[in-house]
A protein has these predicted regions:
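Charged catalytic carboxylate motif
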Residues: 39, 43, 84, 88, ...
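Glycine-rich, phosphate-binding/catalytic loops in enzymes
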Residues: 34, 123, 140-142, 159, ...
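Active-site activation/catalytic loop segments of kinase-like enzymes and analogous catalytic loops
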Residues: 136-168, 178-196, 211
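Active-site acidic catalytic loop and adjacent metal/ATP-binding pocket
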Residues: 5, 91-139
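An alpha-helical support segment within catalytic cores of ATP-dependent transferases
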Residues: 49-108, 118-119, 158, 165-167, ...
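ATP/Mg2+ or Mg2+-diphosphate-binding catalytic cores
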Residues: 73-76, 80, 187-234
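A general structural signal marking secondary-structure boundaries and capping sites
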Residues: 24, 44-52, 96, 146, ...
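ATP-binding pocket architecture of kinase catalytic cores
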Residues: 1-61, 67-83
Length: 234
């Protein structure tokens, strides 16, 4: 799944990986290609089905609670409307935890640029945030980062599952699309509070929140939430 690791020093935190010949770092435009989407779906399925486990867990709701605690201690104001969206998201928390999937080894930060395509397969790189997690998180987060259309999501998920995704699978992926934007909203506010100079993280956080709110208020969202609430066998 990853580029071959040639050397890793756990004490220094340094790693050397083999160069990916003919590798192209993916971007939003590249993922509009059906063949690339198929290879990407296969890559994430290979990761999730590898049979190994990371040493740490990626706990979405614990992370949200931790970020909120940090921001409360810092006395940082949240973007306008965040509290209302957070309250509304409790429905998602209840639905997702009512029918949990077994945790799998997940990337947890599937930026489009963390995927490298050599024309034959897609490699997934940069496992800084990796942990054991609901595999639908990776699919939902990549959909957000790749600005997928519904058609792209269908192609990607069909490649991932090897068959047409069920309403439960699609619904779960959509729930994580909303939740990843909610989580990264808080992450952005933390970066802003710490005066991270790399980017305008306040604007980043506001944009994430607005996208989350737009998705959760869309006409199709209740259908997806209902599919998750009913469970995988309905």
């Amino acid at each position: 799944v990853n580029a071959e690791i040639i050397h890793f020093d756990i004490d220094r935190g340094t790693m050397v990986s083999r160069y990916i010949d003919n590798g192209i770092t993916l971007d939003i435009a590249a993922l509009k290609d059906e063949a690339v989407l198929n290879r990407t779906g296969h890559a994430f399925r290979q990761l999730h089905d590898c049979g190994q486990a990371f040493s740490g867990e990626f706990e979405l709701f614990q992370q949200i609670d931790q970020y909120l605690s940090v921001l409360n201690e810092l006395g940082v104001e949240l973007p306008s409307g965040y509290t209302e969206v957070q309250k509304d998201a409790e429905r998602l928390r209840t639905a997702l935890t009512s029918h949990p999937l077994p945790n799998r080894p997940c990337h947890c930060d599937p930026m489009v640029e963390n995927c490298v395509d050599n024309g034959k397969k897609v490699f997934i790189i940069d496992f800084e945030y990796a942990g054991n997690n609901d595999p639908m998180w990776d699919l939902g987060d990549l959909s957000v980062e790749g600005d997928f259309t519904e058609e792209q999501e269908y192609i990607f998920m069909t490649a991932y599952f090897g068959h047409e995704p069920t309403p439960f699978d699609v619904g779960r992926m959509v729930m994580y699309k909303a939740m990843c934007d909610l989580l990264w909203t808080l992450w952005g506010v933390v970066q802003h509070a710490n005066n991270n100079p790399v980017d305008d993280f306040w604007t980043y956080a506001v944009d994430r929140l607005n996208r989350c709110r737009t998705l959760m208020s869309s006409a199709e969202f209740p259908k997806h939430l209902s599919a998750v609430q009913r469970g995988p066998n309905e």
